[in-house]
């Protein structure tokens, strides 16, 4: 069942986003048919990988969550993500990308190399909605939305941001290909595996 089409992508959505409505899941899985998503959700619930609960009032909806057993699939998704990153940095016609998907690459490739430094934030403007990476005391977290006063803003194609994070491109190369940098570029040197060589 875990190897069935879309199953691991559903697990990924719930790992990144936490409790989700059915409509949130569908929006995060471009291309999935409604009936197939319903079937997969039933199978995952029967297998004990997800659970449902009512949202607190006044919202009348159901939220889906991973169970502990479902969360145990995180290393599987990590391994697949690390293996597949080489394909994420190449342009591909028709590929869709969602802002919250930056959470996995950020976990793979970014580290706070100055945990005693001040909190910083990087706003990512790509895909359907902006995302923010917040770095505080050695911990990186990713969320949807904007930052009030981001230290750095990266704006452009998702693949360019992914390539920069993965070390496939320097900042100069990413800028040459269209990635825009606004703010303190030295923030990249704090989180990237190798110096970014600012454009």
Residue ranges and their predicted role:
Residues 1-32, 47:
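N-terminal helix-turn-helix DNA-binding core of bacterial DNA-binding proteins
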Residues 69-132, 185-199:
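Acidic, aliphatic-rich amphipathic alpha-helical segments
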Residues 37-47:
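Basic amphipathic alpha-helical segments that dock to polyanions
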Residues 45, 54-57:
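CheY-like receiver
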Residues 3, 56-79:
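Basic, amphipathic "hinge/linker" alpha-helix immediately C-terminal to the N-terminal HTH DNA-binding motif
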Residues 147-199:
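C-terminal interaction segments
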């Amino acid at each position: 069942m875990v190897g069935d089409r879309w199953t691991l992508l559903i697990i990924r959505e719930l790992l990144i986003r936490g409790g989700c409505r059915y409509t949130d899941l569908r929006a995060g899985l471009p291309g999935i048919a409604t009936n197939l998503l319903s079937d997969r959700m039933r199978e995952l619930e029967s297998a004990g990988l997800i659970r449902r609960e009512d949202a607190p009032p006044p919202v009348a909806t159901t939220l889906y969550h991973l169970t502990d057993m479902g969360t145990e699939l995180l290393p599987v998704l990590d391994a697949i993500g690390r293996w597949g990153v080489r394909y994420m940095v190449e342009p591909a016609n028709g590929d869709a990308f969602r802002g919250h998907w930056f959470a996995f690459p950020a976990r793979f490739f970014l580290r706070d190399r100055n945990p005693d430094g001040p909190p910083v934030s990087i706003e990512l403007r790509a895909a359907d909605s902006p995302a923010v990476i917040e770095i505080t005391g050695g911990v990186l977290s990713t969320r949807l939305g904007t930052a009030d006063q981001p230290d750095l803003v990266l704006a452009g194609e998702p693949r360019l941001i992914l390539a920069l994070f993965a070390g496939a491109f320097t900042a100069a190369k990413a800028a040459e290909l269209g990635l825009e940098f606004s703010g303190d570029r030295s923030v990249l040197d704090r989180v990237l595996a190798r110096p970014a060589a600012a454009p």
